[in-house]
Amino acid sequence: METERRIITSCSAMTALFLFMTALMASSSIAATPTQSFEDNFNIMWSENHFTTSDDGEIWNLSLDNDTGCGFQTKHMYRFGWFSMKLKLVGGDSAGVVTAYYMCSENGAGPERDEIDFEFLGNRTGQPYIIQTNVYKNGTGNREMRHSLWFDPTKDYHTYSILWNNHQLVFFVDRVPIRVYKNSDKVPNNDFFPNQKPMYLFSSIWNADDWATRGGLEKTDWKKAPFVSSYKDFAVEGCRWKDPFPACVSTTTENWWDQYDAWHLSKTQKMDYAWVQRNLVVYDYCKDSERFPTLPWECSISPWA
């Protein structure tokens, strides 16, 4: 989940408001029902004493202090599906703090891992959060995009979702597609699209003040600790990987998330996606010719198909 280029800009208030209203009016057929309790779905990865729940067990909190952060992962692996969670991010001065919500084929940063990332980059009080997304295939990432948001993600819960099938990866915020990452059989060797390895879903909070905020210029203010991110309403509709004969190797399309309508954006989603591209994109590796004099193969694939 490293990054090499840090660029931060902001969109105008009027543009953000317009997009917000557009998103509110957008319709979508995507739906998923929250599934069971935290204990049914997840294990704590480390620092259990930095994990708390609400009295009813429906809200889960991860905290970071100057000793350690905390993280959890699903008990099961999946290959393709719809994965969704509501998050409320660290409020106030969160510079240097990263909340990560991602899928990975390994429990750790292995050299051959596949990975699909949401990373929420904290900032000084009053400055906007930035969402960074990234995609890894066989240990190679460097496919960062960054977006600003049309709301304050620290004030309330918002839904962050991943649609993953063999045709596309789509990152959603409140049902609005902010990034579309396509597969293609026209690209040689397919060294860019993660479609072979099953993945766990993870979330964690950790200190990344060497790069997360203004390229590392803004450091974490530990006087403001603990920093807390909150979660609820995890939902998954995916193919659970079960050895030795996982059903996920099948090429059938019985599930909605792997049928034709899920292979591309709907007309309404394309409208929302177009507004995001025009107004909220902060950085796109496919447009960084200084970093990539020869752009990666996948940058030539249209997200609109």
Swiss-Prot record:
Sites annotated Important for catalytic activity: D117
Binding site for xyloglucan: E119, Q132, T133, N134, N142, R143, E144, D210, W211, G215, R291
Active site, UniProt feature: E115, E119
Positions glycosylated per UniProt: N61, N66, N123, N138
Biological process terms in GO annotation: cell wall biogenesis; cell wall organization; xyloglucan metabolic process
Post-translational modification: Contains at least one intrachain disulfide bond essential for its enzymatic activity.
Pfam families: Glyco_hydro_16, XET_C
Enzyme class, first EC level, given as a word: transferase
Family note: Belongs to the glycosyl hydrolase 16 family. XTH group 1 subfamily.
Name this protein carries in UniProt: Probable xyloglucan endotransglucosylase/hydrolase protein 8
Gene: XTH8
